[in-house]
Curated annotation (Swiss-Prot):
The lineage of its organism: Eukaryota, Metazoa, Chordata, Craniata, Vertebrata. Mitochondrial nucleotide monophosphate kinase needed for salvage dNTP synthesis that mediates immunomodulatory and antiviral activities through IFN-dependent and IFN-independent pathways. Restricts the replication of multiple viruses including flaviviruses or coronaviruses. Together with viperin/RSAD2 and ddhCTP, suppresses the replication of several coronaviruses through inhibition of the viral RNA-dependent RNA polymerase activities. Concerning flaviviruses, restricts RNA translation when localized to the mitochondria independently of its kinase activity. InterPro entries: P-loop_NTPase (IPR027417), Thymidylate_kin-like_dom (IPR039430), UMP-CMP_kinase_2 (IPR014505). This is UMP-CMP kinase 2, mitochondrial. Residues 380-412 form a coiled coil. Changing residue 330 to E: Catalytically inactive with subsequent loss of NLRP3 inflammasome activation. One of its GO terms (biological process) is dUDP biosynthetic process. GO terms for molecular function: (d)CMP kinase activity; ATP binding; CMP kinase activity; dCMP kinase activity; dTMP kinase activity; nucleoside diphosphate kinase activity; UMP kinase activity. It comes from Mus musculus. PANTHER family: THYMIDYLATE KINASE, UMP-CMP KINASE 2, MITOCHONDRIAL. Belongs to the thymidylate kinase family. Gene3D superfamilies: P-loop containing nucleotide triphosphate hydrolases. It is found in: Mitochondrion. One of its GO terms (cellular component) is nucleoplasm. ATP binds at residues 259-266.
Length: 447
């Protein structure tokens, strides 16, 4: 079943590809719109390419990325037809499962990169998450293994396998393959051409209500889709449904304190609450924190819905406690949104949503704090503190330590939050100095 691989295809293959593409486009007519793709490179830059008709244009960067030596493959997870968030949840689960399968077994021989497919417009629902796989040794069984993996998908919207190949004239082609019985069948082809970088990251239209939720109902709808395969989702929903939809803050101050790893946030929140005789709350709250590990292992849309609903549970507690005492909140909506944006938007700092984008705006139905403080430390102090830490870390905390670009994206995203914005506090000095500074900020904001 395996086919013989060659570094470059013969001349007749390029001619055949052109004829196949012409027939396909004639049959599809105006329905066949070019698909665009973006790939994150090791230096955190993004490269874009589009599928279209053959031209004489050759792009050295694309040839190096997708052409020989070795062989490259791509797959994107499509959305199934349907209304609501069900298709997005299903696609996210397929993508998550494929990632786990690609990281084990014989397909570990392939190098993985993030791939995003998107349409020519900027409408939500066009983005398709996927993978670019690079087989440096061009193993003869890689295509077969990938087709069998995709063939095991039971979902209606099944991913297709694309393979990249250069012809004798140096043009790059993408060919779609299917496994029909025990035969590998090519079902489509198109020429791979460079594309201009869009003005905004192509994922931005899909960020809202897929990673950053604008209201309680949007997050709730996602977990509702999960109750059949995550029993704990029903328990979370039951707790949320016990909370009134509209809550109001009491007469006392509500202060949210945010901070990256090694900023001393946990210690500071305790000290501030003791100094002010305030109630200390955490997000997610203890009533659902027992299920964090379960949801941390789920795809982004499910994980973020869980943390978003945790904020609404905390809001109910804030409303109750702030009638009698000041309230200090250890993390709130800003951290939920910040990590979602920094994780989902591929590439470096320049690809983040621009300032004043809707993803930086506080949800209209979530109780708002009076003041949000963001603790920061300089790099030297951060390294010193991290060396003394041994507690278990979340995936995102581990990423913060290992990936400086991700850390910069998190910091920049925090600083772009609005309504309310974050007040930066340098937490590098001694604990006593930082505590005094924070208490002064709280006092001045309450005047």
């Amino acid at each position: 079943m395996a086919l013989i691989s060659r570094p470059r295809a013969p001349l007749w293959l390029g001619r055949l590809s052109r004829r196949l593409c012409g027939r396909h486009q004639a049959c599809m007519g105006t329905m066949a719109r070019p698909r665009r793709f973006t790939v994150e490179l090791p230096d955190c830059s993004l490269t874009h390419f589009v599928l279209g008709d053959a031209t004489d244009h050759r792009d050295a960067r694309l040839a190096e990325l997708l052409g020989p030596p070795g062989r490259s493959y791509a797959l994107c997870v499509p959305l199934a037809p349907g209304e609501g968030c069900g298709p997005r949840v299903q696609a996210a689960r397929v993508h998550h499962r494929l990632l786990q399968q690609l990281r084990r077994g014989p397909l570990q021989r392939c190098q993985l990169s993030k791939l995003l497919g998107y349409g020519p417009g900027d409408q939500a629902g066009e983005a398709q998450h996927g993978f670019l796989l690079r087989d440096p040794c061009d193993h003869p069984d890689t295509r077969r293994d990938l087709l069998q993996l995709l063939g095991s998908c039971q979902e209606a919207a099944r991913p297709q396998l694309a393979e990249f190949q250069a012809d004798s004239q140096g043009l790059l082609w993408q060919r779609l393959w299917e496994l029909q019985g025990d035969r590998q069948v090519q079902v489509d082809c198109a020429c791979v051409l460079p594309a201009q970088e869009p003005h905004l990251h192509p994922l931005l239209p899909d960020l809202l209500n897929s990673a950053v939720f604008q209201d309680r109902d949007a997050a709730r709808a996602v977990l509702e889709e999960c109750t059949s395969f995550i029993p704990e989702a029903r328990a979370v929903l039951d707790l949320v449904d016990q909370c009134p939809k509209e809550v109001q803050k009491g007469k006392f101050q509500v202060i949210a304190i945010e901070g990256l790893d090694a900023t001393g946030k946990t210690t500071l929140t305790q000290s501030v609450s003791e100094s002010l005789k305030a109630v200390l709350l955490q997000s997610p709250p203890p009533c659902i924190s027992q299920w964090r590990k379960i949801f941390d292992d789920e795809p982004t849309i499910i994980r973020r819905a869980f943390y978003s609903l945790g904020n609404y549970l905390v809001a109910s507690e804030i409303a109750k406690e702030s009638t009698n005492f000041p309230v200090i909140v250890d993390r709130y909506w800003h951290s939920t949104a910040t990590y979602a944006i920094a994780t989902e938007v591929s590439g470096g700092l320049q690809y983040l949503p621009p300032a004043h984008h809707p993803v930086y705006q506080w949800p209209g139905d979530l109780l708002k704090p009076d003041l949000v403080l963001l603790l920061t430390v300089n790099s030297e102090e951060r390294v010193r503190r991290l060396q003394g830490r041994g507690q278990e870390k979340t995936k995102e905390e581990a990423e913060l330590e290992a990936n400086n670009v991700f850390r910069q994206k998190v910091e920049m995203t925090y600083q772009r939050m609005e309504n309310p914005s974050c007040h930066l506090v340098d937490a590098s000095p001694s604990r006593e100095t930082v505590l005094q500074k924070v208490l002064e900020l709280i006092q001045s904001s309450g005047r």
